[in-house]
Amino acid sequence: MKSAILTGLLFVLLCVDHMSSASQSVVATQLIPINTALTPIMMKGQVVNPAGIPFAEMSQIVGKQVNRAVAKDETLMPNMVKTYRAAK
C-alpha cells in the first residue's frame, strides 16, 4: 500500500514539474521489455526530434502495455503503446 501511494505521489510530482514543458515527449528511462505495463518511473520528459507521445499525456499511458521492446532513452511513439489514442 505504501509503495502505491509513493508511486502515485512521484507521478504527481513529475507531472507538476513538467507541466510547462509542452514540447517534451515521453522517453524511456530504462529498457522496457515487450508487453510490459508502463509505470511513471520508466518514463521522463525530454525535448526530442522527431516528437513522440507528448509528455503532457504521460498519465494516459501509465498502465498500458508496450507492443515491442523499448530501448533506454528511446522516444515512445504512439504506435508503440497498446490502445493509446492521442488527446484531441
From Swiss-Prot:
State the Pfam families in the record: SAF (PF08666)
Q: What is its main location?
A: secreted
InterPro entries assigned: AFP_Neu5c_C, AFP_Neu5c_C_sf, Antifreeze_III, SAF
Signal peptide, first to last residue: 1-23
Entry's Gene Ontology cellular component terms: extracellular region
Q: Which UniProt keywords apply?
A: Antifreeze protein, Secreted, Signal
What residues correspond to the site Important for ice-binding?
Answer: 30, 35, 39, 65
Q: Where in the cell is it found?
A: Secreted
- Give the SMART domains listed for this entry: SAF
User: Which residues does the UniProt record annotate as the domain AFP-like?
Assistant: 25-84
The family assignment reads: Belongs to the type-III AFP family.
Q: Function of this protein?
A: Contributes to protect fish blood from freezing at subzero sea water temperatures. Lowers the blood freezing point. Binds to nascent ice crystals and prevents further growth.
Q: What is this protein called?
A: Type-3 ice-structuring protein 1.5
